[in-house]
Amino acid sequence: MAIGITACVLSLINYQGLAYSAALINEPIQACVIAREVDLTDDIRTKFAQCLGWQADQSSPVCLGFYKPITVTPLASPDEVRILADTASFYRTQRSTLSGHVEMQQGQRVVNAQTAYVYRDPKTNEVTKIEFLNHVRYLEPDRMMIARKAVVYPQDKSGEVEDVLYRFNTNRSNALLPAWGRASLIKRFANQDYFLKEATYTTCAPQDKAWAIEAESISINNEKGKGIARNAKLRIHEWPVLYTPYLSFPTNRDRKSGFLMPIVGYSNVGGADLGIPYYWNMAPNYDMTLVPHIYTKRGLMLGGQFRYLTSKSTGTFNGNFLPKDKAFGRFLQDNEVEFPQIRGLSTNRWEVNFVDSTQFLSDLQLNVNFQQVSDDYYLQDFSTNLASVTQRQLLRQADLTYTTENWTFRGMGQSYQTLHPINEIPVSPVYERLPQLMARGYYDDLPFNAQLNILGQYDQFHWPNDSWNIALNNMPQGPRFHLNPILSVPMMKPWGYVTPSVQFVENYYDISRNYTWGTSRANYNLTIPRYSLDGGLYFERDLHLKGTYYIQTLEPRLFYLRVPYYNQTLIPVYDSGFMIFNVDQLFRTNRFSGFDRIGDANQLSYALTTRWLEDESGAEKANFSIGQIKYFSERRVQLCQSPTGFCTDNPDTFGNLSSTFGTSPVASRAVYKFNPAWGITGDYIWDPATRATNNADLNLHYQPARNAIINGGYSYLVNGDVTQVRNNDTENNALHQAILSAAWPLSEKWSGIGAYSYNISKNYSMMSFLGVQYDSCCWAMRILGGRTFRSLNEEFEPRYNNNIYLQILLKGLGSVASSDPSGILNTYIPGYYDPFRRR
């Protein structure tokens, strides 16, 4: 028969008010105590699973089960102590004994055992400790310990547990299950920190042998959410694979300092690659990741990323440094005779990348984007992302923007580092803007509903000297003043609109170093008016398609543009160029980009758009547009520049269209969503002047579930493929390029990822990678291999960077340094969610 504490017992163990009850604890406490030195067998693991509250569930696809929750109903007062037992023997001057279904509760701490001994201070008669023996179960919120012996100290709420099987629920970012393990001793401190002696630690299910940490000691800091294992071994399927004297790991979602999972890889240009990242959580709003890389063919590279977030600023600084690159030294030695430009280059390789956005005031913002590399070959040697490997212009820009109700003011400095790898198509440098000053105003409350846009811009253009293109070193440079006020009067009705507009463009140039024209200075002033009339109608009707009701719109649009001709071939080209023709170009007021060329025009654009909108939600299911420009005169303004004032553009120049044909290409665009998972977009432009396709693209995206993705794309650009020929000249050919990428689950835990990009024009691949990924309950693994186009060799055949990487993620023990070693997954598989990504 269970009994409550009698009155005589009350005087013995009273501690700041004792509450007691005669309720009987009927739940049995299982005997799950096995000495720490006993090896785990399958039978023992099965027994441990029951002890820890593991519930097998085959409907749980990843973990195949779950833990029963740990619930403790707290007492009314955190200092209240309640003790129950079947029998009790009390002594005023000795320890007291409680036997049979013993349960003690203090606040949210509950301890069950078969036997308990109560000790008191002989002077104060206050309870100093309670010792529990035989089938001990120790519970706290998110904590369970089953042990041979436990000692609790009611006064400071600390305790010790011996020969322990434990389960600690922790809120980690990537672990699906609580941590569990064994220890010869666990100390629970008054601040709720824990010290585990001769302990194991894993977040795998009890019967899963995937991985475990076996350590001399493990300290868990509850406040910092951090665990530290000392003299630790990492066991994979019970085999020791790694020893470390110190291992730090998180116990909650907060960022923690410590080593991250290593990066292991191999490439044909760098050899074997081992990266050992260390994450330093400097402050809640500052952190740094240091990544030393060992390349067997190159040497030791030290890299890092520093991130910061303040009330006004956010930014990232990335840097890498590799002294005395062995492979690069051999490259210079082998090629410096044939290519003297590379003679004297340093073998110290480095890069810096700085991005910052600072909001000084609500209307004053600074943006910085700076990138620099040590030499022309750095990106080829150390990047596996096609967009980076083939990049030849690195931006360096800072701008300060101030906004008011009607005006925006901006000051900017901009330059580029131009890369010139040997035996490749020469790349022309880009003009520096040092500085650019811009003011843009907008007023929409004028009489007659008129709107006024004003743009004023000053650019100081500077041409960087380039040892690779000496012939271009005497290019023109100097200031350019640009003014462009626009007055328009939009007249809007529910059924349509008409917007007449008038504007003028004024450019002033003060040119120095006028290259080979025999003059050192020249001034040009240009004032050109523009007139336009834009109008459109809106029609709609109900549409019923496959059981769904839609609203179909029909939107015809006309746009007339008149710009008189002014000869501009004497004026240098700082930032103007041809643009790829598509639907968007139908309604532009200038067929050139930038401000240096103001295209003459006497033309009418006509287009038709139809949309399908879901009747209930308004979501757009389809959008189809088609249009063309009718020219009433030839286009006389040329992009080229000449000291004689007369020149003709090369018809094979990328983006150039016929200047004499009576109509523009026919531009069309389609967007269609078959369902929420499947959509297709495409542009097709047909040129009647050449009776051929001018450019086209088609993109397909299919994503029925997260990380079940198929993307396909094709693009065609006439004259878009610049090819180097044997005599070091270049020729323009049509560019055909296709890309296919996918991420698809192969089973509940296995998935495949891959992408392939092929240059149909040149008959070789640009980029390809293929990987397989395993994502289980407590660990994940990914192996990813591929190659990226690097350059052409002496025989004008493609050369590639070949890479393979292995990543292993032990969930609950830390994250990897980056979402993937090469940074290509999110680039080439839009919509992909990376389980390896550090949040």
UniProtKB/Swiss-Prot annotation:
UniProt keyword Signal present: yes
One GO term of the biological process aspect: Gram-negative-bacterium-type cell outer membrane assembly
Cellular compartment(s): Cell outer membrane
Keyword Membrane: yes
Record field: transmembrane: none
Keywords: Cell outer membrane, Membrane, Signal
Main location: membrane
Pfam hit, one: LptD_N
CC terms in the record's Gene Ontology section: cell outer membrane; transporter complex
UniProt signal peptide: 1-21
PANTHER family associated with the record: LPS-ASSEMBLY PROTEIN (PTHR30189), LPS-ASSEMBLY PROTEIN LPTD (PTHR30189:SF1)
Family: Belongs to the LptD family.
Quaternary structure and interacting proteins, as annotated: Component of the lipopolysaccharide transport and assembly complex. Interacts with LptE and LptA.
Function in brief: Together with LptE, is involved in the assembly of lipopolysaccharide (LPS) at the surface of the outer membrane.
Protein name (Swiss-Prot/TrEMBL): LPS-assembly protein LptD
Species assigned in the record: Legionella pneumophila (strain Lens)
